[in-house]
């Protein structure tokens, strides 16, 4: 590979393009309506498959690659599409480090890695906590089940898929 991009990133790009072309090809071969009806019937399985693929391939929409910029490294390392955004400091300086720090404290309710005294981590939107109340924050389950990196992929992909499916269901109800 002549560019600075890694082979895994190129493989992920290839797979994403291949899947898009496969969907278009199937729609051309079988017709848009039958494929659309099949996708409608299997929308939850397709959504779960998208989440599983993102977790397995470790794909997230995080701008955590900005840390490479601040540390003087190539910012595009391991970026599949787009560029890390400097404006997203709320995510890559605050939210994601708080979520990742929880793995070092065993996902405890209080974490003393930030500040001079233990902080209540359940009150933080992005911090997973190993507690019964975490049942009501399902997007954090990925951190607890899969660890920090794949948990971040689950956090991003599950929120997007659930938002899309909820909007789809809403439009089905009002139409």
At which residue positions do the language-model features occur?
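Active-site lumenal/periplasmic loops and adjacent helix-entry segments of GT-C-fold
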Residues: 67-175
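N-terminal targeting leaders only when they are immediately followed by extended low-complexity/repeat-rich tracts
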Residues: 3, 19-27, 163-166, 170, ...
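Short, strongly hydrophobic alpha-helical membrane anchors
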Residues: 1-7
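Start-transfer (signal-anchor) and selected internal transmembrane alpha helices
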Residues: 8-65, 69-71
């Amino acid at each position: 590979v002549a560019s600075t991009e890694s082979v895994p990133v190129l493989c992920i790009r290839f797979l994403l393009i291949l899947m898009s072309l496969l969907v278009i090809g199937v729609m051309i071969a079988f017709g848009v309506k039958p494929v659309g009806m099949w996708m409608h019937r299997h929308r939850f399985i397709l959504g779960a498959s998208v989440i599983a693929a993102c977790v397995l391939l470790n794909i997230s929409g995080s701008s955590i690659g900005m840390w490479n910029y601040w540390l003087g490294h190539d910012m595009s390392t391991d970026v599949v599409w787009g560029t890390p955004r400097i404006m997203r400091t709320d995510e890559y300086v605050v939210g994601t480090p708080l979520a990742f720090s929880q793995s070092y404290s065993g996902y405890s309710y209080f974490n003393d890695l930030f500040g001079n005294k233990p902080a209540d981590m359940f009150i933080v939107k992005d911090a997973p906590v190993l507690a019964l109340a975490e049942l009501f924050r399902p997007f954090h389950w990925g951190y607890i089940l899969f660890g920090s990196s794949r948990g971040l992929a689950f956090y991003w992909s599950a929120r997007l898929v659930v938002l899309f499916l909820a909007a789809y269901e809403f439009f089905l109800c009002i139409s």
